[in-house]
Amino acid sequence: MIKKYEACFLFKSEELEYKAALEEVKKQLTVFNASDFAENSLGERALEYPIRKQLRGRYEIIEFKMDSENLKELEIQLKLIKNLLRHMILVKINKKVSVKKVKRRNFREFKDNRDIKEKESSEFNSNVDVKVD
C-alpha cells in the first residue's frame, strides 16, 4: 500500500559530508521506489547534546510517497550511511483539525467562585436547626 511519509534527517554539519550523505539518502529513496519528493532544508543548528562527537548538525525534511512494504528495508539502508547522524520517518496524515476557541478564564474567577461556594456551604450548615432528644 502506497503511503505518504515525512522524514527528518540530521546530517553532520560539514558541507561536503552533508551533500554526499543527502545524495546517498535520495539515492536510497529512489532505489526503494519512492516518488513525489518535496525537500525542505532547516539549516544548521547546535545540538543539545553531542551525537557521535558532533555538536552541530544540518536538518533536512523530505516528504515522499512509497510502498509501506519497503519501509523496513529503507530504514536498514539508512542506518548504513556514515554521515547521517539521526533519522525519523513518520506517516503523514492530512486531516484538517478543527480548533475550537475556548474562552480564557482568569485565575481569580476560580478563586472567587471557590470562596463563594465555601461561604454558601458554611451559611447553609449554620442555618440548619438540629433537635437532639
Curated annotation (Swiss-Prot):
GO terms for cellular component: ribonucleoprotein complex; ribosome. GO terms for molecular function: rRNA binding; structural constituent of ribosome. Gene3D superfamilies: 3.30.70.60. SUPFAM superfamilies: Ribosomal protein S6. The keyword rRNA-binding applies. It comes from the Bacteria. GO terms for biological process: translation. InterPro entries: Ribosomal_bS6 (IPR000529), Ribosomal_bS6_sf (IPR035980), Ribosomal_S6_plastid/chlpt (IPR020814), Transl_elong_EF1B/ribsomal_bS6 (IPR014717). Keywords: Ribonucleoprotein, Ribosomal protein, RNA-binding, rRNA-binding. Belongs to the bacterial ribosomal protein bS6 family. Binds together with bS18 to 16S ribosomal RNA. This is Small ribosomal subunit protein bS6. The lineage of its organism: Bacteria, Pseudomonadati, Spirochaetota, Spirochaetia, Spirochaetales. The gene is rpsF.
